[in-house]
Amino acid sequence: MKEQEIQSSMNKSVEATQRNFNTIRTGRANASLLDRISVEYYGAETPIKSLASIATVDSQTISIQPFDISCLQAIEKAISMSDLGITPNNDGKVIRINVPPLTEERRKEFCKLASKYAEEGKVALRNIRRDAVDKEKKDEKEGLISIDESRDNQLEIQKFTDKYISLIETKLSEKEKEILKV
């Protein structure tokens, strides 16, 4: 694998981990909380952000204004059924969500979830490293590159892996601080 391909793949893993982090509640209203919620709309699962305009009104309130009023109840139901622990208020035109402050117990749960997402990201990085190292060893066996080149490349791959794993750990500690901040 080329250096750029490896870095690109690892970057995508870090970005996916960050997207997972963004779906975790922190006690503040954030439109990305609703990213994983899909609504049954004309027989198909559709993300809320495709059906409505989502805005953060203040630090505790999210406003959802559907493009089609007929899907208002479906959006409300999907939010109620989600694992976010928030209750939508429907006024007939707009859904408002008041994001309550997190309890200490809920904060700890979300920290565990963030750790789980971080570990999944690290596993993805290690899989990329394993594939790249296997390719280097295969190229070495086939005589395409020398033993020294193979070792140098493997060391370089390990450096990339360490760099991106530390990036995920940094993002995890930032997210944990954000979650635990009262």
UniProtKB/Swiss-Prot annotation:
Under the heading Pfam families, the entry gives: RRF
The species this protein belongs to is: Prochlorococcus marinus (strain MIT 9515)
Q: Does the keyword Transmembrane apply?
A: no
Q: Name one GO cellular component term.
A: cytoplasm
Q: Does the keyword Protein biosynthesis apply?
A: yes
Q: What does this protein do?
A: Responsible for the release of ribosomes from messenger RNA at the termination of protein biosynthesis. May increase the efficiency of translation by recycling ribosomes from one round of translation to another.
Localization (cell): Cytoplasm
Q: Which domain of life is it from?
A: Bacteria
Keywords for this entry? Cytoplasm, Protein biosynthesis
Q: Record's InterPro entries?
A: Ribosome_recyc_fac (IPR002661), Ribosome_recyc_fac_dom (IPR023584), RRF_sf (IPR036191)
Record's protein name: Ribosome-recycling factor
